Amino acid sequence: MLTSPSLSTLGAMTLSRVYGFKPQSIYKFIEEAGSIENLFRLDDNHRQSLKLGDDALEYSLKEWERMRALGAHFISIEDEAYPKLLRECEDAPIGLYYRSDSEPEEFFSHPMISIVGTRDISPYGRLWCQNIVHALAQTPTKPSIVSGLALGVDGVAHESALRESLPTIAVLPTGIESYSPRSHYQLSEKCAHTPDCALISDFSIGYPVTATNFLRRNRIIAGLSRATILIESKKHGGGLITARLASEYNRDVFVLPGRIDDIRSQGCNNLLEQELAEVIANLETLSSRLGLGRTYLSARGSFCERIENHYGNLPPEMLEDLLKVANCITEHRNDMMEEIAQRCSLTYSRVLSLCMMMQKDGLLQIDLLQRCHIIVKK
């Protein structure tokens, strides 16, 4: 007979695999039995009627062996290390698989902020996602950035956190051994092997990606954190669903404002219209509204200050033109080069030359419409 701790763990793994999409059923069974262990000490015939018989436990034991061979672990909701805010959710997962070089007591100990949004991230969204993470990194209370490891906003959020030396937790829509998307293999490995960071999932080993997985994943992203920040989202985007779930859990929701005619901002603007979210209007006050203390951003400086520091040895006349262009790009983010030239009273060829120089030096990105986007670096 399995020892009590092993029976509790294997029982939670079994419940997660069989009833992962029906958490209410899981908690009904546990409430009736008194605990996970008590549930799996019931008569096998009774448990067979619930699809939780000895054969299901034996399968979980094999899964546990595969899990450990992969360097992964599992904690149940009955474990002290299970994240407190997630435990408060009525549909909380019965357990979590994880891969990390740190213990759950460590990577779940930080205040958590979720950052989510569209896979089709714009240069504007990328810039401000990076800016927001940078601002959070300047707070006295260093939060952990939670997201879903998807393309777009998720990837930028994780990468920015790692660059800023913030912990980050990636919640997967698959088994813990999988990588989705595969292009984020290196990023996922960094999350697994950076101190205080982790990959987590409530899907059993080998569970494939299906469309229904994402809602189940999103409720973990929303439930882990004291607040969710939506960077960009289309009208029916997954990030919008996560933000709505966070609101239903009575957590704070913040959104990056966007143009009313921008398809990537429809979700954010809808939340604002419905008064389900607060607008991010000032990075220096955002962190205090998140309960993280005040942010001090002076060390980073403005884009113009970065230009002045980078090109300080240029002839004064050339530096003056550069600063004109940099200031115009900062204040008029969607202007094309012809419009920048008009605003700065410079020739188009002069602006093109200066912008190409800044792009070559990694300070700007010029798109196909000749709009200039500031590249944020630490």
Go through each PLM region and give its residues.
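Glycine-biased, small-residue-rich flexible motifs in mid-sequence functional cores and linkers
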Residues: 2-5, 76-378
